[in-house]
């Protein structure tokens, strides 16, 4: 149901405004909050990259994207004011829900979603989107993220995105078998 609502909403938003807006996620959140059980939610990150390497995204309970700079050979720090994150869809109703007068929430209402906009990617830079399974991956007391991941990227940054992904995947498993699911998307600017 949520997937279909997203697809229909995305088509509508693209036709009406030429881009996906936070309004789509407000509507999805309201729909999911009203139609699901209290222990059900959806965490997600939605993003789009322009030809000019501007990255617009919305994060609902997902780790922030990482940008590995080919020029500086390290992860780039992103200022906190460029990093708005929100609770998962379905946990809290939106402040401006249409039927707010009849909507109850023991945990209160969430602030309006915001789209983050970054213009950080230079030639050869690598954008990583991942779930908390990668951010929390460990072997005993040793953690994979961020130092070992950054070291791996230094060694494979000259390759294409698929090779980078495969190298990270193999390195994660060599470090230790994951105890949580790990999702990873690798985007490389040419």
Specify the residue positions occupied by each region the protein language model found.
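Conserved subregion of the PPM/PP2C metallophosphatase catalytic domain
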Residues: 8-190
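Conserved long alpha-helical elements within nucleotide-processing catalytic cores of c-di-GMP signaling
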Residues: 1-5
């Amino acid at each position: 149901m949520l997937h279909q609502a997203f697809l229909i909403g995305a088509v509508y938003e693209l036709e009406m405004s030429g881009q996906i807006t936070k309004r789509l996620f407000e509507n999805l959140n309201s729909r999911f909050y009203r139609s699901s059980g209290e222990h059900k939610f959806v965490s997600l990150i939605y993003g789009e990259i322009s030809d000019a390497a501007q990255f617009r995204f919305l994060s609902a309970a997902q780790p922030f994207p990482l940008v590995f700079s080919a020029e500086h050979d390290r992860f780039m720090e992103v200022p906190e004011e460029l990093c708005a994150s929100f609770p998962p869809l379905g946990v809290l109703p939106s402040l401006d829900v249409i039927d707010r007068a009849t909507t109850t929430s023991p945990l209160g209402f969430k602030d309006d979603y915001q789209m983050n906009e970054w213009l950080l990617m230079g030639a050869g830079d690598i954008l990583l989107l991942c779930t908390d399974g990668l951010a929390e991956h460990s072997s005993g007391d040793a953690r994979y993220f961020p130092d070992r991941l950054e070291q791996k990227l230094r060694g494979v940054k000259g390759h294409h995105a698929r090779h980078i992904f495969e190298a990270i995947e193999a390195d994660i498993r060599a470090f230790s078998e994951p105890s949580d699911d790990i999702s990873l998307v690798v985007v490389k600017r040419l």
